[in-house]
């Protein structure tokens, strides 16, 4: 299936709506005559036209041009996208659970509409009618927005920020992963120079944050796999964090312990000793067959042993990640994994839906969406989490996620992950250290934003580290400008 879009300066919205029905369909700029197996959306001086052809059959829809936006009309792009959506919904018999929504932050939309003074009835209409969102998904997003409100008040306090520290090393690469990460065995010589630079960048972040008058709210050490570092390297990094920041005033300090094949009792003890209040142990599945298929070099029993060691080390706020839709998984196997996670009784369980990233091995090897299990049926099993006393506290979506579904963090009451909420709802400055880091500077509740990017690859980050430090000066410059804007005139 191919996508053709003509007559619009940008076909972004149409393209992504078509991919709700045909996830890997390529966009082709010049349609041939008598194109087959395609979706063709076009704006002409006469109106809007959309056509689908597949397996020798075809259907089409037409509509007049919308009224100008200043007169209350929709943009031509949204109108053409909506026309195409209606055609494909009828053609395929599929109603995407999030309707026409292609954005990654539906909960943020609810917060924004409320802040703008919309009534609950107006927000209901926006989701359910204008975007054809299902009642189930909308009610979940709305419940999450309600739960987040008091937490966002903490993150919205003027001058607060969170610190992200990235460790781009893994013992092996999972088949679904597209993140920039280095194989630990191949790139081990790079690890210590990387940690040395990382510690220096953390120190520079503290200097720039102090100059800007910022107060640290939460810390997140992620990856990659942070526990691919040695115990001594973890001590070096976390010792630098402790030496530069008052951890007693931090509401949350998370370290991704990640994979049991590189997480041992000593590392878990170091993480606890140096101030982390929350860790994540990520099985993804408790099926040994599925683990082997995605390239994990450990067993389900290794996960259970790692979890027991974490409890023994005193960790009392643990998240576990599961992924719905992994190659070779089934609804029944996913349910067993979910029940196993619930039986362990962690404070958080996060359920991700597999996303087909173009740089991941499962896409490069040309596996199709039909190769995957019924992911919607898997996510239906998350009712077991609610029955066990967990509640959803954050939600986000990604492009090319199987069956247009979502990722949801579930928690026991009082164990909401603050950093996850802050980064998803974009209400707080995030200062990022490490290769691939993206610092996001935010003021006025997200109305003004600026990004500062680190170099993407670890070797480039190390070799051009002086430039990394120079770019970090943009933090204080951003807030100097903001202060000057507020006090001038």
In which residue ranges do the predicted regions lie?
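Radical SAM enzyme core and accessory elements
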Residues: 1-108, 112-116, 120, 129, ...
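A C-terminal junction/extension of Radical SAM enzymes
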Residues: 34-36, 355, 359-433
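Short beta-strand motif preference
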Residues: 50-52, 165, 279-281
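N-terminal [4Fe-4S]-dependent radical SAM core
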Residues: 88-95, 115-163
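Canonical Radical SAM [4Fe-4S] cluster-binding loop centered on the CxxxCxxC motif
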Residues: 158-195
């Amino acid at each position: 299936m191919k996508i053709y879009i003509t007559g619009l300066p940008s076909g972004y919205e149409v393209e992504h709506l078509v991919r709700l029905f045909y996830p890997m369909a390529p966009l082709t700029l010049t349609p041939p005559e008598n194109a087959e197996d395609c979706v063709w959306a076009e704006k002409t001086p006469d109106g809007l036209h959309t056509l689908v052809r597949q397996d020798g059959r075809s259907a089409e829809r037409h509509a007049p041009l919308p009224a100008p936006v200043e007169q209350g009309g929709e943009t031509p792009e949204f109108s053409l996208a909506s026309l195409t959506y209606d055609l494909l919904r009828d053609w395929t018999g599929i109603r995407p659970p999030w309707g026409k929504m292609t954005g990654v932050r539906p909960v943020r939309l609810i917060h924004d509409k409320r802040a703008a003074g919309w009534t609950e009835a107006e927000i209901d209409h926006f989701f359910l009618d204008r975007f054809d969102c299902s009642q189930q998904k909308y009610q979940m997003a709305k419940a999450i927005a309600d739960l987040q409100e008091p937490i966002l008040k903490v993150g919205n306090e003027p001058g607060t920020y969170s610190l992200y520290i990235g460790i781009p090393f893994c013992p092996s690469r999972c088949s679904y992963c597209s993140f920039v990460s280095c194989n630990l065995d191949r790139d081990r010589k790079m690890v210590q120079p990387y940690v040395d630079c990382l510690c220096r960048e953390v120190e520079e972040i503290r200097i720039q944050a102090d100059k800007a008058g910022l107060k640290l709210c939460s810390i997140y050490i992620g990856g990659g796999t942070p526990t691919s570092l040695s115990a001594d390297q973890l001590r070096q990094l976390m010792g630098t964090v402790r030496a530069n920041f008052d951890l007693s005033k931090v509401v949350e300090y998370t370290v991704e312990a990640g994979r049991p094949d590189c997480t041992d009792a000593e590392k878990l003890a170091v993480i606890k000793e140096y101030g982390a209040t929350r860790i994540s142990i990520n099985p993804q599945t408790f099926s040994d067959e599925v683990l082997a298929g995605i390239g994990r070099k450990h067993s389900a029993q290794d996960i259970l042993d790692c979890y027991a060691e974490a409890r023994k080390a005193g960790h009392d706020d643990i998240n576990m990640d599961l992924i719905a839709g992994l190659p070779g998984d089934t609804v029944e196997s996913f349910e067993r994994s979910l029940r196993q996670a619930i039986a362990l009784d962690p404070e958080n369980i996060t359920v991700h839906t597999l996303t087909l990233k173009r740089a991941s091995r499962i896409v490069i090897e040309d596996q199709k969406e039909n190769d995957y299990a019924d992911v919607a049926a898997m996510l239906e099993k998350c009712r077991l989490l609610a029955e066990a006393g967990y509640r959803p506290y954050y939600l986000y979506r990604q492009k090319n996620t199987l069956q247009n579904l979502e990722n949801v963090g579930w928690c026991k009451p009082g164990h909401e992950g603050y950093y996850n909420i802050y980064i998803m709802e974009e209400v707080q400055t995030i200062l990022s250290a490490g290769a691939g880091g993206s610092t996001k500077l935010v003021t006025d509740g997200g109305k003004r934003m600026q990004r500062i990017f680190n170099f993407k690859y670890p070797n480039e980050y190390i070799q051009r580290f002086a430039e990394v430090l120079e770019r970090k000066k943009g933090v204080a410059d951003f807030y100097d400008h903001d202060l000057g804007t507020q006090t001038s005139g």
